[in-house]
UniProtKB/Swiss-Prot annotation:
Role this protein plays: This protein is involved in the repair of mismatches in DNA. It is required for dam-dependent methyl-directed DNA mismatch repair. May act as a 'molecular matchmaker', a protein that promotes the formation of a stable complex between two or more DNA-binding proteins in an ATP-dependent manner without itself being part of a final effector complex.
MF-aspect GO terms: ATP binding; ATP hydrolysis activity; ATP-dependent DNA damage sensor activity; mismatched DNA binding
Keywords: DNA damage, DNA repair
Encoding gene, per UniProt annotation: mutL
Source organism of the structure: Streptococcus pyogenes serotype M12 (strain MGAS2096)
UniProt similarity note: Belongs to the DNA mismatch repair MutL/HexB family.
Protein transport among keywords: no
One Pfam assignment: MutL_C
Bridged cysteine pairs (disulfide): none
Name assigned to this protein: DNA mismatch repair protein MutL
Length: 660
């Protein structure tokens, strides 16, 4: 008697379903991909209870014949490949013949389909993979597949499902990715009778992006294009000022298939170079057309991982396309704008005769307790803004009512502000150790700063500066060299930390409400977690498609911080599933101190330099900037004498002393 048996087909399909069907979103993905392969131009996805109760996908594609319909539930039965050679030149999204049998084995499935060649269609009903009904019916050309009671016979899988809102967010994300991959198809997603996504299907990728991420986001995206003999790269990338807290907004498409690829993600970030802040990621939609022989999609059950030949060449192509596109934009603010913390750009060129003969310098204002640039040639006043240079511009209004097609309440065009995402204020080269996305590392930094003890600072006598970066001072312990940027970062950090430490739970009504726009999946996740935002005084109301409105703000948040602050709190919530005023304010103090500190290569006059050292001496910890870098180093008199060999020690080299 043999111990090895061939598994029944239904059981084999259920085992395969464990790899192919992880959650309701997996079913939506497989059914929609089949509809795309059937050359559909319109696809409608309807779901109930986040797909656990019902998923229905309707398309106007080629349909199936009466003879092919029962074969579609047979494992490894497919119309997309017929020979081994076809496996290496796949242009369809599906090809294994596993998805539909796997879905049918763990649900009740109803299929209505018809082709153009016949006068009638077909109906198939199956439960648990067993066909119960197969008959001729009257139905339009195309296919309608309804999946009900998903996982009814695999209760263990149901146990690992997340909340309905979380599962719905996964479905929205799948439909959004497929919409971006195929802008020529009109997609509609309806959940419990409510329309969540709709694209026009015009073939214009920019319109598809606008339908998913919103018109305001699309306006801040640049077109990219590059090609060589093997690859053709095109798509859209966001300006460096428009970023998100994770990589979820980076979409890479290969021959119309959404894939995940770490190296290509790295190439995208390399294309931005130092223009992105550490821990921030751009919004990217990149379409790569490639010879199927150079891409192996048969390496993962969900086909989201693809092996690509000549991957290094493709990485270089992507990086070059992005960097060249960004070069054409005016991304670098002038020094005066940066130091004055202005959010308004002035592009008028002064005449050469108006330029001063002396070099630009930094000066200290004791009344304002801050540094400023004295520039006689500049006559126009630049308004001061806070922390984020990307804070909301009061001149930005909602100009067209059609931007809010589903508003429950009509608000005049000039009575709301569109909140802007915060711009990057410093780059990886400023602080390579600061990663706001690494919550564990950030938490360690905040704990270290919180537990700092009062330090005693030596009395210093300033006497000079080098390269507009380092200050020289002497004390009784010898020579001190101070990093002026790190020094003022420490001063500013402790100032902002103390200033914004108190939190008031009161709310203040906004004269002009703010609108906050999110992607479909983030919008759904935030609705589920809104109670956590309410606990810290942020009350967002649903206002139209993927949009919230804020009518009042907590007192602890300044009005000029509202746009950037609310987005930061929402990003924190989406990233960590928690939101903390303490963490937000600590991060804010760190980043404000960096933003508002003097940079390298700026000369200080003697008064400003001496005043900076006096402020530094009053700090709780004057020896390190908030990121942990040293503020100053010391050479004692003995060190100096050893370096100049005024002191010789027997049998001890200068290198062993570590001082030369």
């Amino acid at each position: 008697m043999t111990n090895i048996i061939e598994l029944p087909e239904v059981l084999a399909n259920q085992i395969a379903a464990g790899e192919v069907v992880e959650r309701p979103a997996s079913v939506v993905k497989e059914l929609v991909e089949n509809a795309i392969d059937a050359k559909s131009s319109q696809i409608t996805v309807e779901i109930e209870e986040s797909g656990l109760k019902m998923i229905q996908v309707t398309d106007n594609g080629e349909g199936m014949s009466h003879e092919d319909l029962p074969l579609s539930l047979r494992r490894h039965a497919t119309s997309k490949i017929k020979s081994q050679s076809d496996l290496f030149r796949i242009r369809t999204l599906g090809f294994r013949g596993e998805a539909l049998p796997s879905v049918a084995s763990i649900s009740k499935i109803t299929i209505k389909t018809a082709t153009k060649e016949v006068t009638h269609g077909s109906l198939l009903i199956a439960t648990g993979g067993e066909i119960e009904t197969l008959e001729a019916i009257s139905t339009p050309t195309g296919t309608k597949i309804k999946v009900e009671n998903l996982f009814y016979n695999t209760p263990a899988r149901l146990k690992y499902m997340k909340s309905l809102q979380a599962e719905l967010a996964h479905i929205v994300d799948v439909v959004n990715r497929l919409s971006l991959a195929h802008p020529e198809v009109a997609f509609t997603l309806i959940s419990d009778g409510r329309q969540l996504t709709q694209t026009s299907g015009t073939g214009d990728l920019r319109q598809a992006i606008a339908g998913i991420y919103g018109l305001n986001t699309t306006k801040k995206m640049l077109v990219i294009s590059n090609a060589d003999l093997d690859f053709e790269v095109s798509g859209y990338v966001s300006l460096p000022e428009l970023t998100r807290a994770n990589r979820n907004y980076m979409t890479i498409l290969v021959n119309g298939r959404y894939i995940k690829n770490f190296l290509l993600n790295r190439a995208i970030l390399d294309g931005y170079g130092s223009k992105l802040m550490v821990g921030r990621f751009p919004i990217v939609v990149i379409d790569i057309q490639i010879d199927p022989y150079l891409a192996d999609v048969n390496v993962h059950p969900t086909k989201q991982e693809v092996r690509i030949s000549k991957e290094r060449e493709l990485m270089a192509l992507i990086s070059t396309a992005i960097s060249e596109s960004l070069k054409e934009q005016d991304l670098i603010p002038d020094a005066l704008e940066n130091l004055a913390k202005s959010s308004t750009r002035h592009f008028s060129k002064p005449e050469q005769t108006q330029l001063p003969l002396q070099s630009r310098g930094l000066y200290y204002d004791p009344q304002k307790n801050d540094f400023f640039v004295k520039e006689s040639a500049v006559s126009e006043k630049i308004p001061e803004t806070d922390f984020y240079s990307g804070a909301v511009d009061n001149s930005v209004k909602v100009e067209k009512a059609e931007l809010l097609p589903h508003s429950e309440e009509v608000i005049g065009p000039s009575s709301v502000k569109h909140a802007s995402r915060p711009q990057n204020t410093f780059t990886e080269t400023d602080h390579p150790n600061l990663d706001l996305k690494n919550r564990q590392k950030l938490s360690q930094m905040l704990n270290r700063l919180e537990n700092e003890e009062q330090s005693v600072f030596p009395e210093l006598d300033y006497f000079g500066q080098m390269h507009g970066t380092y200050l020289f001072a002497q004390g009784k312990d010898g020579l001190f060299i101070i990093d002026q940027h790190a020094a003022q970062e420490r001063v500013k950090y402790e100032y902002y930390r103390d200033k914004i430490g108190d939190v008031d739970s009161s709310l203040q009504q906004l004269l002009v409400p703010y609108l906050f726009e999110f992607s479909g999946s983030d919008f759904i996740n935030l609705q589920e977690k809104m109670a956590l935002l309410n606990e810290v005084g942020i009350f967002l109301e649903v206002y139209g498609h993927n949009t919230f409105i804020l009518r009042e703000h907590p007192i602890w948040m300044k009005e000029e911080e509202i746009a950037s602050g609310v987005y930061e709190m929402c990003d924190m919530l989406l990233l960590t599933n928690e939101v903390s005023i303490k963490t937000y304010r600590a991060e804010l103090a760190i980043m404000m101190s960096c933003k508002r500190s003097i940079k390298a290569n700026h000369s200080l006059d003697d008064y400003s330099a001496r005043n900076l050292l006096l402020q530094l001496a009053q700090c709780q910890n004057p020896y390190n900037c908030p990121h942990g870098r040293p503020v100053l180093i010391n050479f004692s008199k003995a060190d100096m004498e050893k370096m100049f060999r005024r002191i010789q020690e027997n049998h001890t080299s200068l290198r062993e002393l570590g001082k030369y």
